[in-house]
Amino acid sequence: MDPNCSCTAGGSCACPGSCKCKECKCTSCKKSCCSCCPVGCAKCAQGCICKGASDKCSCCA
């Protein structure tokens, strides 16, 4: 698994929760690259943690 999660710039993240992205360029989650974050979540860049298999994360819930 690529630790940097090379997401397409401006695209949506599809990285697993176990992936610690360092260079994710997704607009939805710039830092943590959480797949559970909705598009347009302004708090994702602060670092979010996906809650299990749910579609919510700690910063966007």
Swiss-Prot record:
Residues 30-61 are annotated as: Alpha. A divalent metal cation 5 binds at residues 34, 36-37, 50. Keywords: Acetylation, Metal-binding, Metal-thiolate cluster, Phosphoprotein, Zinc. A divalent metal cation 7 binds at residues 50, 57, 59-60. One of its GO terms (molecular function) is zinc ion binding. Class I metallothioneins contain 2 metal-binding domains: four divalent ions are chelated within cluster A of the alpha domain and are coordinated via cysteinyl thiolate bridges to 11 cysteine ligands. Cluster B, the corresponding region within the beta domain, can ligate three divalent ions to 9 cysteines. This is Metallothionein-2. A divalent metal cation 2 binds at residues 7, 13, 15, 26. A divalent metal cation 6 binds at residues 37, 41, 44, 60. It comes from Stenella coeruleoalba. The lineage of its organism: Eukaryota, Metazoa, Chordata, Craniata, Vertebrata. Metallothioneins have a high content of cysteine residues that bind various heavy metals; these proteins are transcriptionally regulated by both heavy metals and glucocorticoids. The keyword Acetylation applies. A divalent metal cation 4 binds at residues 33-34, 44, 48. A divalent metal cation 1 binds at residues 5, 7, 21, 24. Disulfide bonds: none annotated. Residues 1-29 are annotated as: Beta. Belongs to the metallothionein superfamily. Type 1 family. GO terms for cellular component: cytoplasm; nucleus. Pfam families: Metallothio.
